[in-house]
Amino acid sequence: MSNFNSSPVPTIFMSFFQMTKRVRLSDSFNPVYPYEDESTSQHPFINPGFISPNGFTQSPDGVLTLKCLTPLTTTGGSLQLKVGGGLTIDDTDGFLKENISAATPLVKTGHSIGLSLGPGLGTNENKLCAKLGEGLTFNSNNICIDDNINTLWTGVNPTTANCQIMASSESNDCKLILTLVKTGGLVTAFVYVIGVSNDFNMLTTHKNINFTAELFFDSTGNLLTSLSSLKTPLNHKSGQNMATGALTNAKGFMPSTTAYPFNVNSREKENYIYGTCYYTASDHTAFPIDISVMLNQRALNNETSYCIRVTWSWNTGVAPEVQTSATTLVTSPFTFYYIREDD
């Protein structure tokens, strides 16, 4: 058996050892990137341990380059930023700046783009919105007329007496149901009374009687309850009830002082509206009631800017009810119209 240590090394292993020997760099090799050999201008294939693949790559092998993703690029050996139509590079200071022009209704102020708003537009919670004036509202994102704001009333049927008509009464003796609705330049008025106190209902036992509800208003159209027969303020409609908020301006519901002036005797007849309503007696007989409406004409004091007086009267051969069978006095509704004051 031959000794292994004395055997010659096979040629194939010798070649492998020679190939794996570290190549000796020339004395002119520059160890600073790009690692050129000054004598040959060659890039030796090296991969220093301080080069991270994060942000760098070798392309081709041995040549260190940057990894660039849009909007970065390299053009002519320089790292550059791709800019679109809205950006540019300032030639003076090299700063990146916007290159945007604004067309109407957009406006550019400094570095901000804004929207020029005209009447009827505004912002709410950073959203563009339409401004709605009094009488308009949104319904399912559509603009519509707020019918409630065009109505001023006592409600459908007050739960308790709200009006004191009889001079002998020390408290409210009836319910006055009044509705005023603005319709263009006119107001449509709807009125009737329901008796509450026994004294008021006993009026039906008289053959000749009249009673008046006086309504006095200030310059904004608010009812002066201390002076008026109606002791509860009017308010806008909210469903079948009165709105609960304060009434700010009801001037547009008032009778026009131009059409129905105060204290002008020569035009006194213009201030009156006449008509007929009815009382249905216990035996179902319909008794006619004369009704007259006086608009403005006489002011009670300096507080009064507008007034409406409604008078009911009858003069019949027999009383609607006999003395011992007085029932609730309910007049049928009466509708009338008048020219309204400007809002």
From Swiss-Prot:
GO cellular component labels: host cell nucleus; viral capsid
Superkingdom of this protein's organism: Viruses
Matches recorded under Pfam families: Adeno_knob (PF00541), Adeno_shaft (PF00608)
UniProt record, GO biological process: adhesion receptor-mediated virion attachment to host cell; cell adhesion; symbiont entry into host cell
Residues spanning the signal sequence: none
Induction line: Expressed in the late phase of the viral replicative cycle.
Alphabetized UniProt keyword annotations: Capsid protein, Host nucleus, Host-virus interaction, Late protein, Viral attachment to host adhesion receptor, Viral attachment to host cell, Virion, Virus entry into host cell
Alphabetical list of SUPFAM superfamilies matching this protein: Fibre shaft of virus attachment proteins, Virus attachment protein globular domain
Main location: virion
Subcellular location(s) per record: Virion; Host nucleus
Keyword Protease attributed: no
Gene3D superfamilies, sorted: Adenovirus pIV-related, attachment domain, reovirus attachment protein sigma1, domain 1
Domains as described in the record: The tail region anchors the fiber to penton base capsomers, whereas the shaft, built from several repeated motifs, allows the knob to protrude from the virion.
Note: All late proteins expressed from the major late promoter are produced by alternative splicing and alternative polyadenylation of the same gene giving rise to non-overlapping ORFs. A leader sequence is present in the N-terminus of all these mRNAs and is recognized by the viral shutoff protein to provide expression although conventional translation via ribosome scanning from the cap has been shut off in the host cell.
Its job: Forms spikes that protrude from each vertex of the icosahedral capsid. Interacts with host receptor CD46 to provide virion initial attachment to target cell. Fiber proteins are shed during virus entry, when virus is still at the cell surface.
Subunit structure: Homotrimer. Interacts with host receptor CD46. Interacts (via N-terminal tail region) with pentons.
This protein's name: Fiber protein
